[in-house]
Amino acid sequence: VIGGDECNINEHNFLVALYEYWSQSFLCGGTLINGEWVLTAAHCDRKHILIYVGVHDRSVQFDKEQRRFPKEKYFFNCRNNFTKWDKDIMLIRLNKPVSYSEHIAPLSLPSSPPIVGSVCRVMGWGTIKSPQETLPDVPHCANINLLDYEVCRTAHPQFRLPATIRILCAGVLEGGIDTCHRDSGGPLICNGEFQGIVSWGDGSCAQPDKPALYSKVFDHLDWIQNIIAGSETVNCPS
C-alpha cells in the first residue's frame, strides 16, 4: 500500500498472506471469510501455495500464527457475458479449519452493495514504493474512495474495459495513496463491509487520476455461498 501507515495489529485479523511454497516468496494477500475458506484474486494462483493466518510482522515467527495449504481452489468460470476482468477471483478451501484467536477472525461477506462515494480501507504487505519495489515486514493500511466505474474506464483506455462489469473502481484522484504490487488479493472494506478484492491497476501505482480496479464481492455472493455450501451446481449470475 502506497501512502498508508502500518496497520493496527488488531484491525486485520482476517487478512492472510499467500506465499509460493518452494521459494517462500510472498505473493499476495487474501481474506478469511470463515474458518475454512479464503477469498483472494485468481491472478495470485500458483501450483504450490502456503497460507499464513494471524500474521502481522512477516519477518518474525509469531507464536499464534497458523499455516495452511489449499485443499481445493475454485475459479469463477462462468462463460456468458463475462470478461477476464470479471474473473479475477479465487476461493480457497483450507486443508483444515483455522482456530480463531485475538489475531484470527473472519470478515463477513457484504450484506448490501457498495455505495459510490464511500470511504474504503485497504491493507496489505504490498510495496510501499513505486515503481521500485520495497516490501514492508508489516501490513500497511490506507483509506481510499469508492469512485464511479466510468472514472476507471476513462483513466485506463488501454484496458478497453467493458461498459458493464462486476468490478469496482477505487482510489484517490489526487494521487499518492493506492494499493500496489503484492497487495493483490487483499480486501477493500467500505463502510465496514468487505466489498472488493485488490485486482489490477496502472503499472506505477498512486498516480493522479489513475484509480485501481477491485473485483466486486457483492456480485459474486451466490457463487461463493453455493461453493461453500457444497452445492453441485454453481449458478452463474445472469
Curated annotation (Swiss-Prot):
Temperature profile: Thermostable. Activity is stable after incubation at 100 degrees Celsius for 30 minutes.
Keywords annotated in UniProt: Blood coagulation cascade activating toxin, Disulfide bond, Hemostasis impairing toxin, Hydrolase, Ion channel impairing toxin, Potassium channel impairing toxin, Protease, Secreted, Serine protease, Toxin, Voltage-gated potassium channel impairing toxin
Main location: secreted
InterPro entries: Peptidase_S1_PA, Peptidase_S1_PA_chymotrypsin, Peptidase_S1A, Serine_Proteases_S1, Trypsin_dom, TRYPSIN_HIS
GO molecular function: potassium channel regulator activity; serine-type endopeptidase activity; toxin activity
Site keyed Pharmacophore that directly interacts to Kv10.1/KCNH1/EAG1 channel selectivity filter: positions: 79
Impact upon substituting residue 43 to R: No change in inhibition potency of Kv10.1/KCNH1/EAG1
Known partners and oligomeric status: Monomer.
Note: Negative results: recombinant protein has no activity on many tested channels (Shaker IR, Kv1.4/KCNA4, Kv2.1/KCNB1, hKv11.1/KCNH2/ERG1, rNav1.1/SCN1A, rNav1.2/SCN2A, rNav1.3/SCN3A, rNav1.4/SCN4A, hNav1.5/SCN5A, mNav1.6/SCN8A, hNav1.8/SCN10A). PEGylation of both native and recombinant forms increases 5-6-fold hERG1 inhibition (IC(50)=22.4 uM for PEG-collinein-1 and IC(50)=10.0 uM for PEGrCollinein-1). In contrast, PEGylated proteins displays a great loss in the capability of inhibiting Kv10.1/KCNH1/EAG1, compared to their non-PEGylated counterparts.
Protein name: Thrombin-like enzyme collinein-1
Annotated source species: Crotalus durissus collilineatus (Brazilian rattlesnake)
